């Protein structure tokens, strides 16, 4: 079957490349940004569920650690974990329309980033990861495109919630360079400060060649180990001295280079190579907030490191007949090196003091080939047909996560058909895809874009994803936009690997009184979601107003199973990762941009969540605000001076309704976070045409939240040893922080 799939991929690529006729050489200067036709991908950027963040917006509102801070100000976007557990609560990642970080696809220049997939998934689906939004320095970003709902489905695996496409600044045929620096100073000394500096250089390498090079170094200190002292949930017995940790620190080192060859008009080849190293500065976190003297001794140390290498070759082409192609191959290697961790019960995700190795490695190799062609067609109506194919392979060598013992202490006994020792550290999966879209201008005011995508996964089989987007002008000022698409996400390499086994003595087991195992399941189905949206938009003389309703009918969400699939000889129940039949996410997004005057602009967006429900259990899918309002007032006081005020208002945040055994949450597990707001001020001064300064303050009124623990109680509140649940209080909101940045360029 795989040979047939590979042969089909080769034929499709040959067919795509054979469509176009080379353009005759001319003396016309080459523009790197020429748009030949309006493709379906470009039309999708006009959908109601699409937002763009510009380089100037990033410059005037600089971020500290990574760009997730500014991405979260877009409609439908928040920061959260992958479940309602609250585990790793300060490692919050991008969540789009309540679908969770695992359903948010991160791209850099249109190419997927998968480094976070090298981090083990815990029993509740959480990963101890900072996500994939910090691999590009903020100052090197040209723009960020955030796609939500049906517009994102064209990107295939992992885009059921949405897509974040980070577009980097490009090289040119002229010499240019930049140097940037950023630092902040939290008003509370127990909160970690950030310093960052980076450079870029672009220029010609002869008549047809150009290059771009950038480098970056930044450091964020860890929060104090006792930052949450006095705010922790109730703890007793052996847990009495434990504390939930604050935000960990991080040291980033990045270097990236691109060489471009414009070998003919509208024809270019780009070769990219990049290397990044991210090391944490440990703040004391454990998966179950059950720190001890050994974990506390690691405070401030580097306990995990990610080494990322990426290489890509891209060919973009255009021809006299209007045909354009985009073809690339990317290789990404991530080495996740970390202190060995436990895999059983309360020790899961906790440093293993008895480990014989200081660090163990998880290596993830990701290869992707992508080819697409855009064909302008003048038949009945103006239309542009897009045809494409992709092939992706992920291979993992994990020397850490498949090592849970099945015999001896802290185990549940042997499992039939599973080796008690020396289980294979290897796992892999492949996806072959075909896709087609057609952007049709039926009238001057009506655009219809149907699409169809086919994915074949080497483990879970085939998936078909149809899509339809419609844009209908209603007079000069109003536009009605609608979309529906079937989105798709394949299970992770952990969820499908039978050698990945976790153990619990009982509390983690949904319907078992005693101990149980959780095992990877190679018989899983892919997650799917029918994403729908309807939006009405008004534009006139700089005014913009819009409202969008969205609903995602979620099928086969993958979670730890609720029903034991068997029992071993000593009575230990066996659970597997399983598909939840149905879930639903529904909400509203609104926007209002008002040109108050020639120099003052007021921009606003709001997201209101109507539903977020697992229909099997009745529980919430994630802990996110009921509503989020983002408002920015920008004033161009002088030609060289601009000022901004930002206001964000978060609605109440409700915790999970049920514990891991399906019993209603009680006592402190039901704590909600009340609505709160964050205000920021900033000013940008263009000192000269080559130098600008930005200074400001985040969280002006010093509204802080403290992490109290995980959502659910560990142990028995009526017993001697327990950690009470914290409800929704699972993360830290940092207080007032002053910052300054310097941007220079030539």
Swiss-Prot record:
GO terms for molecular function: colicin transmembrane transporter activity; enterobactin binding; enterobactin transmembrane transporter activity; ferric-enterobactin transmembrane transporter activity; ligand-gated channel activity; protein domain specific binding; siderophore uptake transmembrane transporter activity; signaling receptor activity. Residues 79-93 have a biased composition (Polar residues). CDD domains: ligand_gated_channel. Keywords: Cell outer membrane, Ion transport, Iron, Iron transport, Membrane, Receptor, Signal, TonB box, Transmembrane, Transmembrane beta strand, Transport. A motif (TonB C-terminal box) lies at residues 729-746. Residues 1-22 form the signal peptide. InterPro entries: Plug_dom, Plug_dom_sf, TonB-dep_rcpt-like, TonB-dep_rcpt_b-brl, TonB_box_CS, TonB_rcpt_b-brl_sf, TonB_rcpt_CS, TonB_sidphr_rcpt. It is a multi-pass membrane protein. GO terms for biological process: colicin transport; enterobactin transport; ferric-enterobactin import into cell; intracellular iron ion homeostasis; siderophore transmembrane transport; siderophore-dependent iron import into cell. A motif (TonB box) lies at residues 34-41. It is found in: Cell outer membrane. Its main location: membrane. Residues 174-746 form the TBDR beta-barrel domain. Residues 42-169 form the TBDR plug domain. Induction: Induced 1.9-fold by hydroxyurea. One of its GO terms (cellular component) is cell envelope. Residues 76-96 are annotated as: Disordered. Belongs to the TonB-dependent receptor family. This protein is involved in the initial step of iron uptake by binding ferrienterobactin (Fe-ENT), an iron chelatin siderophore that allows E.coli to extract iron from the environment. FepA also acts as a receptor for colicins B and D. This is Ferrienterobactin receptor. It comes from Escherichia coli (strain K12). The lineage of its organism: Bacteria, Pseudomonadati, Pseudomonadota, Gammaproteobacteria, Enterobacterales.
